[in-house]
Amino acid sequence: MAVYCSEQKTRMLKNDTVVGQNMRAYLLSLLMITVSLAGCISNEDNASTDIGNTTEDDLVLPEWQIGDQWLYTFITPQFGEDSTRLVVADVREDDGLFMLGISSEGEAQRHAVINHNPFLGRVTMDGLSVYENGEPQPVFNFPWEAGNTWAFRLLGQDWSATTDNIYNGEVTVSASSTEGHQLSYVFSGRQGFIMSLLWADNEGVVNLQMSLIQKDTGYTGDVFFYRAGDLHDNLYEENDQEIYDSFFDEGYSPNEAWDTLVWYLDVEIDDKGGSGTLTISDQQDGSSPLSRAWGNGATEKGSFGTIPSKTGEHRITLTLQGETSFVHLKVAGALVRSWTL
């Protein structure tokens, strides 16, 4: 009997040991599953916070309406700091285009002659592509996705772009050009346009900065756009003799004349006995719609204006005295478009 009890006790102990081992294995498996699930949940949480509170609407093509407006600060080497308002002036459903104008006619003229604001005029409805050399350029890449790469042409450069980051509805893009220029901008899906932009050349000189001050809707007033074509761009330096040059006004096309010509001047006259004069004359009637004279040490930085467009040759006559004296003259033809909202 004693032997039997001992054997039973031995069996029970063995059974308890097996059960304990099985239980520990079960609990260990459960713990591993729990940790694994916690890791998955943690990874999902981290992935969702990588883009902050960005929504799907922030990543897709924004919907523009007539009267939408963005007030920007522009900084350029020629003009320093200036604020201007970009406005959706028209929606052309027939050809799939927005017309983006500017609330200042002077700013529209600046764009015509120095092209310092690339986001004026025609903008495609299917991607907010802007036009350069008559072709739409995909500056933006909807729907936004981090890591995407693409190419476009803007500001006279061919760019390779990358979507670097997306956070709280703002998309950061960087691009480099074949000539070593750098471009970066932040696009806001919630504001429907660019928050900031910076363009620097291959020497690190910042050619353009844009910063959004305010987004609004329901603009009322006049809006302008000068669609331009370059006619003349030359830098003249000190010369003991009169300088003669010319440019031709052949109109926008054989069937359409320019509405006006826009000129730009950047002038420095030597402060040691320097002087200078400039005249632009119409060869047909002999009129001189633009005349300038500068004395010792004079400067005229980034001035601009308009003269009548007359088909044919325009003659340029300059005098420049002084070792460091120079005149930079640019002329563009422009078709003038305006809207009243």
Predicted segments — roles?
Residues 235-258:
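Non-catalytic, beta-strand-enriched accessory regions in extracellular/secretory proteins
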Residues 252, 294-311:
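Beta-sandwich interaction modules
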Residues 253-264, 311-313:
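Extended extracellular/luminal ectodomain segments enriched in beta-structured repeat modules
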Residues 273-288:
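Short, surface-exposed beta-strand/strand-loop-strand elements in extracellular ectodomains
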Residues 274-276, 323-337:
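Edge beta-strands of jelly-roll/beta-sandwich modules across compartments, strongly enriched
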